[in-house]
A protein has these predicted regions:
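Short loop/helix-cap segments at secondary-structure boundaries that form the rim of catalytic
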Residues: 45, 202-206, 252-259
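General small-molecule cofactor/ligand-binding pocket signal
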Residues: 193-195
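Long, positively charged, glycine-interspersed low-complexity recognition regions
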Residues: 217-218, 224-327
């Protein structure tokens, strides 16, 4: 199962394994929940009485609320093709659930900021969508005829034609729909709360298991905001001194006194470079012995290598977008 919304930097494929590696507790806190993969896995696990997800990104919290708590707010059957102008307007307005939905189904790499297609793809994708979704048969036929004329006129290569079959917007929308269906039918009684706010303003006292998945050092940050790594390390030290049970997903040790307790290797398919193994690590604010004494740790039964994750190449800028930034 893939957890969470389509979102840059998501832990969607390894979310269950991360939650399995956490101790059980009363109140679980994900301090920068992003696409909600960890909060969804934690809620479904039944290991906690309450799960709370914080994120500074208003639009992603709004979308998580609509798909994991307040169901029935999204019309999945009549979602239109979105132009670049409409995407930019929704991104800049950032007020309604439809604005939030457009940002994360119609953006490159689901980053919420950059339009999904370059100019040369937009006309084809729009015509393909119209050939399926327009209300009357005559309109659909005309869109299909226009699409075929464009193909003949522009003489696309086989690779370009194959690329057109990737239905990015529909795939993202379907993924969001699956999240809502899963959460709507869940059997766990765990209470889920989602809050828009900074991790530095969280009242940590009531939480007994705390998890951070910050932007990784050396990668592009999210939501066009610079992340304060120095302040973050100080926060980790404060929580550790308070005796809190704290975990951090990172590539390297996030702060002094944090110990690597698990690692997860996933194969990432980079269009220009082939498969690249990426190792993500889980750090605990204490020793390995202290970690092993925690209650509620699950046995990890899944294989160490994850299913391949496709990361797209942005032919507009000649950059490759990974799950943690542009390289």
């Amino acid at each position: 199962m893939v957890y969470g919304l389509p979102y840059k930097g998501s832990k969607n494929i390894i979310a269950k394994r991360i939650v399995d590696a956490l101790p059980s507790g009363t109140n679980f806190l994900d301090c920068c929940c992003g696409g909600g993969a960890i909060v969804q896995a934690a809620t479904l696990s039944g290991k906690f009485n309450t799960v709370t997800g914080y994120d500074i990104n208003k639009s992603i919290i709004g979308l998580l609320q609509a798909t994991m708590v307040d169901f029935g707010k999204i019309d999945y059957e009549n979602f239109p093709v979105v132009s670049k102008e409409e995407f930019c307007a929704a991104r800049d307005r950032n007020e309604t659930i439809n604005d939030f939905l457009i940002q994360y189904t119609c953006s490159f790499g689901n980053n919420g900021t950059t339009y999904l297609w370059g100019e040369h793809k937009t006309k084809y994708k729009t015509l393909m969508h119209n050939a399926i979704a327009l209300p009357t048969m005559d309109q659909r036929r005309q869109a299909l005829r226009d699409f075929m004329r464009c193909l003949v006129k522009d003489r696309l290569s086989n690779a370009e034609l194959e690329n057109l079959t990737v239905l990015d917007q529909a795939t993202s929308l379907n993924r969001i729909h699956k999240v809502e269906n899963t959460m709507r039918s869940r059997k766990s009684k765990t209470k889920l709360d989602l809050v828009c706010g900074s991790m530095f303003d969280i009242p940590f006292e009531k939480y007994d298991v705390i998890y951070f998945d910050p932007p990784y050092v050396g990668t592009s940050c999210y939501n066009k905001k610079n992340f304060d790594f120095i302040r973050f390390r100080k926060l980790l030290q404060v929580l550790k001194d308070m005796g809190k049970t704290v975990f951090v997903s990172e590539y390297n040790q996030p702060a002094e006194g944090f110990t690597e307790v698990k690692s997860f290797v996933k194969m990432m398919l980079m269009n220009s470079k082939g498969n690249i193994p990426v190792q993500e690590k889980l750090f605990y604010g204490g020793s390995k012995e202290q970690y092993n004494s925690l209650e509620g740790l699950s046995t990890l039964s899944e294989p160490d290598i994850d299913t391949t994750v496709l990361d797209d190449t942005d032919e507009r800028a000649g950059e490759v977008e990974t799950d943690r930034g542009v390289v």
